[in-house]
Structure formats: structure tokens, C-alpha cells
């Protein structure tokens, strides 16, 4: 099955390495642990911001966010406006949780996004690879059971192959 293949690849093909950790404070709360991961295949760095403690037996609030230059920084998609600050505010309010920011560095990522905006198409992209990177970061952090922070009802692909479970959902809300 696909879950078996994913499980095999997770156990045999580790594609991320934890390269740096630092305690940080931000406009959205103090005492965040910032962990930098590097994808061993393309050397791209991804970020996990951890608030509070992680217990592998507990349900942990988690937001996995695919960073996009134009949507997150320029604001070309009003549906994604302010999602990173809202996520950090929500996790800070909960006093525990993780925000994972996965960078999309595929060739043509920016131009393909802009073309899909104009043509009103799904940008598709390399979601499977992004899920794999995010899942391996969650595993490295010791997370098994997640309270998914999201306003979307989309179900991520084959999480059981990663031995990850979405046990509940938590709306992102307005970030206040």
C-alpha cells in the first residue's frame, strides 16, 4: 500500500537534518524555540517554531505552512493574508504548539503561482514533497498526535504512513 511505501521511505530515507536551534522572542510571544532543518537533497532550509513542551503522548497543536513569497509577503491572495502571524498568535494563546514553515523552492515556483492566479487554476505544485518534509520534521520533534490548526477541511495525504494522526482540528480564527 501507499502507507507501507511511505513508512519504508521514512525509516530508510531521512531527507532532513536539524542544523540549528535558538530561543527567540517575537511580536507574537516570547520563548519560542526556533529550529532550522535542512533538506539533504536540495539544501533548502525549513523552520519549526515550537512553543511550550512537546510530549509524544499528548495532542499537540500544529500548523504546517508552505511559504510562498507572493502570497505570504506581497499579499496577492487575500485568503492567505497574515496566516503566519495569525498562526503564531493562536499557538501563543494556546501556550503550546508548533508552526512548521516549509519553503517551496521548485523551479518556476513564483512564476507558476502567478500564472495560476491569473488563470484561476490550482497551483498544484509539489505538495507531496512538502508533506514529506513537514512530516519528517513532525517526527523529529516527537509529535504523533496533532490538533491541526487550519480553517481548511482538506485532509493531508496518507499521514498514517508517517505514523501521524490528526486527532482534532482547531480553527485558525482571526488571530486576536
Tell me what each language-model feature is.
Residues 2-176:
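Catalytic domains of riboflavin
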Amino acid at each position: 500500500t501507499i502507507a507501507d511505501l511511505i513508512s519504508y521511505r521514512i525509516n530508510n530515507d531521512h531527507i532532513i537534518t536539524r542544523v540549528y536551534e535558538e530561543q527567540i522572542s517575537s511580536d507574537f510571544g516570547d520563548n519560542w524555540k526556533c529550529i532550522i532543518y535542512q533538506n539533504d537533497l536540495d539544501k533548502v532550509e525549513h523552520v519549526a517554531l515550537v512553543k511550550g513542551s512537546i510530549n509524544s503522548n499528548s495532542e499537540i497543536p500544529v500548523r504546517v505552512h508552505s511559504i510562498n513569497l507572493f502570497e505570504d509577503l506581497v499579499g496577492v491572495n487575500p485568503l492567505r493574508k497574515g496566516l503566519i502571524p495569525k498562526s503564531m498568535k493562536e499557538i501563543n494563546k494556546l501556550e503550546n504548539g508548533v508552526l512548521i514553515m516549509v519553503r517551496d523552492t521548485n523551479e518556476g515556483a513564483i512564476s507558476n503561482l502567478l500564472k495560476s492566479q491569473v488563470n484561476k487554476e490550482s497551483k498544484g505544485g509539489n505538495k507531496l514533497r512538502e508533506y514529506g518534509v513537514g512530516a519528517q520534521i513532525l517526527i523529529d520533534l516527537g509529535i504523533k498526535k496533532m490538533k491541526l490548526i487550519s480553517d481548511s477541511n482538506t485532509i493531508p495525504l496518507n499521514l498514517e504512513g508517517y505514523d501521524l494522526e490528526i486527532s482534532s482540528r482547531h480553527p485558525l480564527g482571526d488571530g486576536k
